[in-house]
Amino acid sequence: RALVKKPKMLLLDEPLSNLDARLRLQTREEIRRIQKTTGITTVFVTHDQEEAMSISDKIVVMKLGEEQQIGAPQDVYNSPAHLFVAQFLGNPPINVFEGRIENGSIYIGDEAVFHTETAVMDQPLYIAIRPEGMIVEDSEEGFGFHADIDQVQVLGRDLFLVAKHDACTKKTFKCILSSDQVITAKRVKLALKPNKFFLFDHKTEQRIYIKENPAPASQGEKEVSNNG
C-alpha cells in the first residue's frame, strides 16, 4: 500500500521481528530487491545486526537515542569507532580483553601481543579481537598470548575454538579457524591479525587508532595519536 503512493521515503520499523528465521531471510532479500528496483530511500529500523549488514547501503548505530557511528556496513564492521559498535556487529560477537599499552607494546595479561609505532600514552585499555582475527601460532617466539582450550567445534568449513583467558571480559571467547586444522593441545598460543583487532579507551570506550590499523578514509577521520 505504501509503494502505490510512490513516496519519497519509506520508514520500516522492525517489519520482520515476528517472522520465523527462514521467512525473515526470504523477506529481507525481497525488501532489498524492491528498494533497489524502486530507488525509494528507505529507513529500516532493526535490532538484528545481520539484517542491518545484509540490507543496508549505510548503517547508523544508535545507543540510548544517540548516534554512535554511521557508515557503509563493511566500514563500520572493519573499523568500529566505539566499543559498543564493535560488540553490536559480528556473529559470533567480538572478543573483548582487559589489556594495557606500555612503551608501544600491547599486552593481554603479561604477554605482549602487538607493538605499534604510534605514540600512545601508557594506559589500561580494552583490546577487542574478531573471532576470525586470531591464528594458532606454533612458535613460542614473537607476539601472542596463551589460552586454555575449553571446546573444539567443527562446523562445516569452520572450526570454532572456544577458549578461556583470565583477561577476557566473558567466561570464554571464540576463535574461528579453518576446519582442516587439527587442534589436540589443551593450551595454545594465539597471534593477532593486524587488521582484526581494535583498541578502546578504558574509560570512554572510544577507539584508539594506530597507524597499523587506522580509520578508513570514508570515516573522514585521521589516525589518532593519543598522547593524553
Language-model-detected regions and their locations in the chain:
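Secondary-structure boundary/capping signal
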Residues: 39-42, 84, 93, 171, ...
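C-terminal boundary and immediately downstream tail of ABC-type ATPase nucleotide-binding domains
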Residues: 78-101, 128
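Non-catalytic connector elements of ABC transporters
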Residues: 105-228
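ABC ATPase nucleotide-binding domains
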Residues: 1-84
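Residues that scaffold the ATP/ADP-binding catalytic core of kinase and kinase-like folds
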Residues: 26, 79, 87-88, 137, ...
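Generic secondary-structure boundary/loop-capping signal
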Residues: 20-22, 50, 67, 73-74, ...
